[in-house]
Curated annotation (Swiss-Prot):
Role summary: Sliding clamp subunit that acts as a moving platform for DNA processing. Responsible for tethering the catalytic subunit of DNA polymerase and other proteins to DNA during high-speed replication.
Subunit structure: Homotrimer. The subunits circularize to form a toroid; DNA passes through its center. Replication factor C (RFC) is required to load the toroid on the DNA.
Keywords: DNA replication, DNA-binding
Family membership noted in the UniProt record: Belongs to the PCNA family.
Molecular function in Gene Ontology: DNA binding; DNA polymerase processivity factor activity
Pfam families in the record: PCNA_C (PF02747), PCNA_N (PF00705)
Gene Ontology biological process terms from the UniProt entry: leading strand elongation; regulation of DNA replication
Record-given protein name: DNA polymerase sliding clamp
Gene3D superfamilies with a match to the protein in the record: 3.70.10.10
Positions of disulphide bridges: none
Native source organism of the sequence: Methanothrix thermoacetophila (strain DSM 6194 / JCM 14653 / NBRC 101360 / PT)
Highest rank taxon of the organism: Archaea
Length: 244
């Protein structure tokens, strides 16, 4: 059972953070909120999303699972104006999700959860370097890096966080000392990542006041942030191998 009311923009932002990587997901419904974990088809990136019950204006649920087509859900949510509320009601017998926006009511057919790719096991990584920066600053750096290359290096040396992108002709480098960051745990780190993935992720990251980056040497990058109203998002992105 699920009955809930939530701000349309809050739900749209949460869904966008996931739909940049996958089209279909299995939501786990709990009394504490909605959760999901998913991996992209190429097994390069993972995403974890948790929408706390406190993010909803009204939330009543019993434990269960539902499979959702995020493309269709996003399309329906695009009908809601800023400031509008979205009403959600699970029709268990019909295996549908009723979505209400203003005077409109839609029914979204659900997917059998067993038909959706199994949730990934998110590895527990003890990455040495932690950096916290404004989401908008990270988004701007990623957009700038895209202009010169299709990959970017993220690293930490001493008290400096840096991002480097090199193309055939042009190059870009961002450096920020610990005093310019929101927070920092120094540690030797340097890894190369695909800008295709980071660009998709950064659309949601740019809306967060603060984003935490956890980096190692040729290790996956963990990106954690919170969108408004208690929506928790975490990405894990596999590194690329640097060519000598």
């Amino acid at each position: 059972m699920l009955k809930a009311v939530i701000d349309a923009e809050t739900l749209r932002d949460a869904i966008e953070a996931v739909s940049s990587l996958v089209d279909e997901v299995k939501f786990t419904i709990t009394e504490k909120g909605l959760e999901l974990k998913a991996v992209d088809p190429a097994n390069v990136a993972m995403v974890s999303l948790k929408i706390d019950a406190s993010a909803f204006e009204f939330y009543q649920a019993t434990p269960g699972e539902i499979g959702v087509d995020l493309v269709r859900l996003s399309d329906l949510l695009s009908m809601a104006d800023r400031g509008e509320r979205v009403r959600l009601e699970l029709l268990e017998d019909e295996r549908k999700l009723r979505i209400g926006v203003g005077s409109l009511s839609y029914t979204l057919s659900l997917i059998d959860p067993s038909a959706i790719r199994k949730e990934p096991r998110i590895p527990e990584l003890d990455l040495p370097a932690h950096v916290a920066i404004p989401g908008a600053e990270f988004r701007r750096a990623i957009k700038a890096a895209e202009k010169v290359s299709d990959h970017v290096v993220l690293g930490v040396k001493d008290d400096i966080f840096y991002m480097e992108a090199k193309g055939d002709i042009d190059a870009l480098k961002l450096t920020m000392r610990s005093s310019e960051l929101l927070d920092m745990k120094p540690g030797e780190a340097r890894s190369l990542f695909s800008l295709d993935y980071l660009s998709d992720m950064s659309k949601s990251i740019g809306k967060a006041p603060e984003v935490k980056l956890e980096i190692g040497i040729d290790y996956p990058l963990r990106i954690s942030f919170m969108l408004k109203d208690n929506v928790h998002v975490s990405y894990l992105l596999a590194p690329r191998i640097e060519q000598e």
